[in-house]
From Swiss-Prot:
Interacts with HSP90AA1, HSP90AB1, PPP5C, ROCK1 and ROCK2. The modification Phosphoserine is found at residue 51. Zn(2+) 3 binds at residues 157, 162, 176, 216. Signal peptide: none annotated. Disulfide bonds: none annotated. This is Cysteine and histidine-rich domain-containing protein 1. Regulates centrosome duplication, probably by inhibiting the kinase activity of ROCK2. Proposed to act as co-chaperone for HSP90. May play a role in the regulation of NOD1 via a HSP90 chaperone complex. In vitro, has intrinsic chaperone activity. This function may be achieved by inhibiting association of ROCK2 with NPM1. Plays a role in ensuring the localization of the tyrosine kinase receptor EGFR to the plasma membrane, and thus ensures the subsequent regulation of EGFR activity and EGF-induced actin cytoskeleton remodeling. Involved in stress response. Prevents tumorigenesis. Zn(2+) 4 binds at residues 179, 194-195, 211. Pfam families: CHORD, CS. The gene is CHORDC1.
Length: 332
């Protein structure tokens, strides 16, 4: 029976009887994410593309490992006896205070409202970085391996969550099981936007089986600019919600962020030839006129002013049950 290898960067299935000391190629280090760059602590290679990060070949040989790494242990909280707790409680007189009347919730506007371009604020660091790139771009041109139509043996599939490698023409006929969404890292949790199976352990996240079937993508042949995923997260205060997209050297003249009260469409062009797209059906209602975008050399921050001061349960509004059923019927 084939077992799944849990060594970082491997994810292959293996036969325990044929397992040898050099059967597995893996990363002994840990994943490192810094300023939109992704890599392994044991290797020097860095990339901004998450699918390229997943396809970085391991730097160490060893035996396959079938033992699943344990989930992070939560600290045990010990409580004292009820008597001791009651003695520690401060003694005071009760005063009943009438709570203020709740603020009437704003009625959710129609998603068909016209979209408005959010104001772009460009930082000095981004202006300096773009000026340097313009000076150097006229002297250097790098040829990439992806420009070639030839697929080399051992090339990793570029689909998210797929760990298969190209072994010859027969690989073109294989069914690819992958994640059609993008990776999301938020408040210590890691998951794919397409299936939302959340985990706090990075190895478990990498080992999650895909939720979509299709054909392997051995090369990226996007004409012109390439649409790529970007690491992004969000946070909120009482009056604002902020989305951070970690894309370096974004181009203000080619980028656009539009929104209405309940929808947000993000289109960012960065590093000359890469594009990031994201459409968000917002959980709450925003004030478009008081919302704006700040573009720096390392990231883009979308600051949205809340129409009412309330805590958002999530960034995106969950799909209605009728919409989910329609999606399931179309996928089947």
């Amino acid at each position: 029976m084939a077992l799944l290898c849990y060594n970082r960067g491997c994810g292959q299935r293996f036969d325990p009887e044929t397992n040898s000391d050099d059967a597995c190629t893996y990363h002994p280090g840990v994943p490192v994410f810094h300023d939109a760059l992704k890599g392994w602590s044991c290797c020097k290679r860095r990339t901004t593309d998450f699918s390229d990060f997943l396809s970085i070949v391991g730097c160490t040989k060893g035996r396959h490992n079938s033992e699943k790494p344990p989930e992070p242990v939560k600290p045990e909280v010990k409580t004292t006896e009820k008597k001791e707790l009651s003695e520690l409680k401060p003694k005071f007189q009760e005063h009943i205070i009438q709570a203020p009347k709740p603020v009437e919730a704003i009625k959710r506007p129609s998603p068909d409202e016209p979209m408005t371009n959010l104001e772009l604020k460009i930082s000095a660091s981004l202006k300096q970085a773009l000026d340097k790139l313009k000076l150097s771009s006229g002297n250097e041109e790098n040829k990439k391996e992806e420009d070639s139509d030839e697929i080399k043996i051992g090339t990793s599939c570029k689909n998210g969550g797929c760990s298969k490698t190209y072994q010859g023409p027969q690989s073109l006929e294989e069914v690819c099981v992958y994640h059609s969404g993008v990776p999301i890292f938020h408040e210590g949790m890691k998951y794919w936007s397409c299936c939302r199976r959340k985990t706090s352990d990075f190895n478990t996240f990498l080992a999650q089986e895909g939720c979509t079937t299709g054909k392997h993508m051995w090369t990226k042949k996007d004409a012109g600019k390439k649409v790529v995923p970007c690491r992004h997260d969000w946070h909120q205060t009482g009056g604002e919600v902020t989305i951070s997209v970690y894309a370096k050297n974004s181009l203000p003249e080619l980028s656009q962020v539009v929104a209405n009260s309940t929808l947000l469409n993000v289109h960012i062009v960065f590093e000359g030839e890469k594009e990031f797209h994201q459409n968000v059906k917002l959980w709450g209602v925003i004030d478009v006129k008081r919302s704006y975008v700040t573009m720096t050399a390392t990231k883009i921050e979308i600051t949205m002013r809340k129409a009412e001061p309330m805590q958002w349960a999530s960034l995106e509004l969950p799909a209605a049950k009728t919409e989910e059923k329609q999606k399931e019927e179309t996928t089947e």
